[in-house]
Curated annotation (Swiss-Prot):
Reaction catalysed by this enzyme: L-methionine(out) + ATP + H2O = L-methionine(in) + ADP + phosphate + H(+); D-methionine(out) + ATP + H2O = D-methionine(in) + ADP + phosphate + H(+)
Name of the featured protein: Methionine import ATP-binding protein MetN
Alphabetic keyword roster: Amino-acid transport, ATP-binding, Cell membrane, Membrane, Nucleotide-binding, Translocase, Transport
Enzyme class: translocase
Annotated SMART domains: AAA, NIL
Family designation: Belongs to the ABC transporter superfamily. Methionine importer (TC 3.A.1.24) family.
Residue ranges that the Swiss-Prot or TrEMBL entry lists as coiled coil: none
Species assigned in the record: Streptococcus pyogenes serotype M2 (strain MGAS10270)
EC number: 7.4.2.11
Domain ABC transporter: 8-250
Gene designation per UniProt: metN
Binding-site residues for ATP, renumbered to this chain: G42, Y43, S44, G45, A46, G47, K48, S49
Gene Ontology cellular-component terms listed: plasma membrane
Bilayer disposition of the protein: Peripheral membrane protein
Length: 354
């Protein structure tokens, strides 16, 4: 089991503006393990970016304790490292942002080299390092191009290479794909996953999009109004969300809310027979391998009309979501529901026949 590389314990962040007191983060505890791709999700103003800025002490908390890679960096209201030690700790943490922050008058390789200006490497070693980094992010052929000659995705690749220049153990991505189109977003996420595997890089993803969490993260924390309201593995959160906001994020990411709107307009649902019901089935892991609907027909003579179906792979585990009309004798439907529950399927009744 991997050890925690980032420990944020009981973090409070309060801002004072004249007579106003703004509690941006309230008593948040988050532990992120070495090698995690950890998502922190929430709407604008949730406090997620403010929270993550305390990892490298770009933002000092009001209260709480911060431990990064075994070193306590903040405790008892003050920074625990010397100025030199803090600078070194910050070199272990790379950051990428929504806006690429590249220098327009410098080429791609010069932008990456800029991050090495305080490195102890020789000039030749720096040149080799820059070439290696651009190859790592798949941009070696664009080394001599200026930012104006690059697409949004290519600019973000340069920014990632620059963030990796000092061999960080942690990479923080603050809405880094928000300005990109869907295809480019997928390419950047695939690159981050590759870097996570190849370098053992711990990645912290700040986002307002649960789709990104679903695509890349293994754990997720959900924030609302400065409070951490839910945290766990992506599989657990997606298959069994407890908070209303989490459920809202997930229905948006899976598209099931749009599917339900269309399903409710279908005649079969509008005029549901007395011996039928509309149900949502959620299942994970080995349950996705079983022909369960076929089984309940054979055992209980309950038919299932599939109106919507979707299977996602979350952290290498299949998770399914299905909306069906179950039809049969009332006692048989009850028996079928019980059998589905026993097989590990969560059954939610959306509508009963009149």
């Amino acid at each position: 089991m991997n050890e925690a590389i980032i420990q944020l314990d009981h973090i409070d962040i309060t801002f004072r503006q004249k007579k106003r007191v703004i509690e941006a983060v309230k008593d948040v505890t988050v532990h992120i393990n070495q090698g995690d791709i950890y998502g922190i999700v929430g709407y604008s103003g949730a406090g997620k970016s403010t929270l993550v800025r305390v990892i490298n002490l770009l933002q000092a908390p009001t209260n709480g304790k911060i431990t990064v890679d075994g070193d306590v960096t903040f405790d008892q209201g003050k920074i625990q490292l010397s100025a030199d030690a803090l600078r070194q700790k910050r070199r272990d943490i790379g950051m990428i942002f929504q806006h690429f922050n590249l220098m327009a008058q410098k080429t791609a390789k010069e932008n990456v080299a800029f991050a090495l200006r305080h490195s102890s490497l020789s000039k030749t070693e720096k040149e080799h390092k820059v070439i290696e980094l651009l190859e790592l992010v798949g941009l070696s052929e664009r080394a001599d191009n200026y930012p104006a000659q690059l697409s949004g995705g290519q600019k973000q690749r340069v920014a990632i290479a620059r963030a990796l220049a000092n061999d960080p153990k942690i990479l923080i991505s603050d809405e880094a794909t928000s300005a990109l189109d869907p295809k480019t977003t997928k390419q950047i996420l695939a690159l981050l996953q590759e870097l996570n595997c190849k370098l053992g890089l711990t990645i912290v993803m700040i986002t307002h999009e649960m789709q990104i969490v679903k695509d890349i993260c293994n754990r997720v924390a959900v924030m609302q109004n400065g409070v951490l309201i839910e945290e766990g593995s992506v599989l657990d959160i997606f298959s069994n969300p407890k908070e209303a906001l989490t459920q809202e994020f997930i229905t948006t990411a899976t598209g099931i809310d749009e599917a339900l709107e269309k399903i409710n307009q279908q005649d079969i649902v509008k005029h549901l027979p007395a011996n039928a019901l509309l149900a949502q089935l959620k299942y994970a892991g080995t349950s996705t391998d079983e022909p369960l609907l076929n089984s309940i027909y054979r055992q209980f003579e309950v038919t299932a009309n599939i109106l919507y179906g979707n299977i996602e792979i979350l952290d290498h585990i299949p998770v399914g979501d299905m909306i069906v009309v179950l039809e049969g004798q009332a006692e048989n439907i009850l028996a079928a529901e019980k059998a589905l529950h026993e097989a590990g399927v969560d059954v939610s009744i959306l509508k009963r026949g009149a």
